[in-house]
């Protein structure tokens, strides 16, 4: 069976031009124009998808099969090209019958051309083949356009579904163009509207808890760039004005012992007029023990020093993936559960914006894992948000799972985050010592997001940072009142 790609090559039909026209028409459709205006960040993501569309269309045209009737007509045309004019005259009746039997668009015109000329000349032979070729090119082009139109409708339907999904989730998960691009890539899965509405629901809850959202942003930014002085700095002259004490008599600051006659206290001056005390006065004058007023002032002078020219390189601290462990015990149900899920959604938003990974582990009596930043991130997020917190608390297993994950090179420089109320039994000594070793040797950082004010200090002491979000009724009312 002849393929459409082979037919295009034989007839020199330019499929690239047809593909480009179809893509331009798709991007100019009213549905996409409205969407681009409403969500400009996603426009770049969709535009970046165009090469994939182009390649898919090429593959579709390459694998498409030509109808048997057209295949037979093309074969007949190729054989006719090899005939000389006398041979063509002999084969002409069979050619006309074949065209009629195949319902070729060229059949009627071919018969009219032959009937209009009583003699078949070499020029008529050439004209017949040229017009037949034009008819085949038109048929091949029409077939290409039909297939591309089918693909356009299918592609437009797919894009509209993804636009609906991305448009709903863009305000929740896309903080910049990078996040918008990753969100668009994730939207390729088969999702129903009721599924992703769960993400919308928790996104709205997160907006109602700005303190929780701000806490997630602070945790995400906890690794800031550090400035490091250069070692090859040159020396430069630095001038500054310094203030220092002076003897300029500006104000009385107290009393002192000295030989300053001009600032003698009246009682000291009185002893000079008493004969019996005159020698005592001179002795104290020589020894600078007379009581005098202490006057002080201040003066400014220019100080010149040499110091290195300060040039600093900013060492951007690596922001690795998030490994988030969520306590799903019964005490974490209700409002705590909503806050924990919304906090993970906020970390997912940060991970998408900063091109980081976000890995979720639910721990109770068993551990369930989700990766929210992978190609199936939206589906994974929906499955995570659908979980209910009704298990027990096994914090030790949580830490062991984190430490096992940190052994892999792909999780180098990860931030481990544990979300819990930390109302649990103390950690085993081997777990505590291993965590401290990871902190000391590999500089891994462990964050605690405490959902209760009653967490055990002995457990929380192991963390590098403790982010508190009290979910008690009093704290909730205070937060609402402050807004």
UniProtKB/Swiss-Prot annotation:
This is Regulatory protein ViaA. The gene is viaA. NCBIfam families: PRK10997.1. Component of the RavA-ViaA chaperone complex, which may act on the membrane to optimize the function of some of the respiratory chains. ViaA stimulates the ATPase activity of RavA. It comes from Escherichia coli O7:K1 (strain IAI39 / ExPEC). SUPFAM superfamilies: vWA-like (SSF53300). PANTHER family: PROTEIN VIAA. It comes from the Bacteria. It is found in: Cytoplasm. GO terms for cellular component: cytosol. The keyword Cytoplasm applies. It holds the Pfam family VWA_CoxE. Its main location: cytoplasm. Belongs to the ViaA family.
């Amino acid at each position: 069976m002849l393929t459409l790609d082979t037919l295009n090559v034989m007839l020199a039909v330019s499929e690239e031009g047809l593909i480009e026209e179809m893509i331009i028409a798709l991007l100019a459709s009213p549905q996409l124009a409205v969407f681009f205006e409403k969500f400009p960040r996603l426009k770049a993501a969709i535009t970046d998808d165009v090469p994939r569309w182009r390649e898919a269309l090429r593959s579709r045209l390459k694998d498409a099969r030509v109808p048997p009737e057209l295949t037979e007509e093309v074969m007949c045309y190729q054989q006719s090209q090899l005939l000389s004019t006398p041979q063509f005259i002999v084969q002409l009746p069979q050619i006309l019958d074949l065209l009629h039997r195949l319902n070729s668009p060229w059949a009627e015109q071919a018969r009219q051309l032959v009937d209009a000329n009583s003699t078949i000349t070499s020029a008529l032979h050439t004209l017949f083949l040229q017009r037949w070729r034009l008819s085949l090119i038109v048929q091949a082009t029409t077939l290409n356009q039909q297939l591309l139109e089918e693909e356009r409708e299918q592609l437009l339907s797919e894009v509209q579904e993804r636009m609906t999904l991305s448009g709903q989730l863009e305000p929740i998960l896309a903080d910049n163009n990078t996040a918008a691009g990753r969100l668009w890539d994730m939207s390729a899965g088969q999702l129903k509207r009721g599924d992703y509405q769960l993400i919308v629901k928790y996104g709205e809850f997160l907006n109602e808890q700005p303190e929780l959202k701000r806490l997630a942003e602070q945790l995400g930014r906890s690794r800031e760039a550090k400035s490091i002085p250069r070692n090859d700095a040159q020396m430069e002259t630095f001038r500054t004005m310094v203030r220092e004490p002076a003897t300029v008599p500006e104000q009385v600051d107290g009393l002192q012992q000295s030989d300053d006659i001009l600032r003698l206290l009246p009682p000291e001056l009185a002893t000079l007029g008493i004969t019996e005390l005159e020698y005592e006065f001179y002795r104290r004058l020589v020894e600078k023990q007379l009581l005098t007023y202490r006057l002080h002032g201040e003066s400014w002078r220019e100080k010149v020093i040499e110091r290195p020219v300060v040039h600093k390189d900013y060492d951007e601290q690596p922001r690795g993936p998030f490994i988030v462990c969520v306590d799903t015990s019964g005490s974490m149900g209700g409002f705590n559960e909503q806050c924990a899920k919304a906090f993970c959604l906020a970390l997912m938003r940060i991970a998408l914006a900063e091109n980081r990974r976000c890995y979720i582990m639910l721990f109770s009596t068993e551990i369930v894992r989700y990766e929210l930043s992978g190609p199936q991130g939206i589906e994974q997020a929906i499955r995570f948000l659908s979980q209910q917190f009704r298990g027990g608390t096994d914090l030790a297993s949580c830490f062991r799972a984190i430490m096992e994950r940190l052994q892999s090179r792909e999780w180098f420089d990860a931030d481990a985050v544990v979300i819990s109320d930390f109302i649990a039994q103390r950690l085993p000594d081997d777990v505590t010592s291993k965590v401290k070793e990871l902190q000391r040797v590999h500089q891994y950082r462990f964050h605690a997001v405490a959902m209760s004010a009653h967490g055990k200090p002995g457990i929380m002491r192991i963390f590098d940072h403790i982010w508190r979000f009290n979910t008690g009724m009093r704290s909730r009312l205070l937060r609402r009142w402050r807004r």
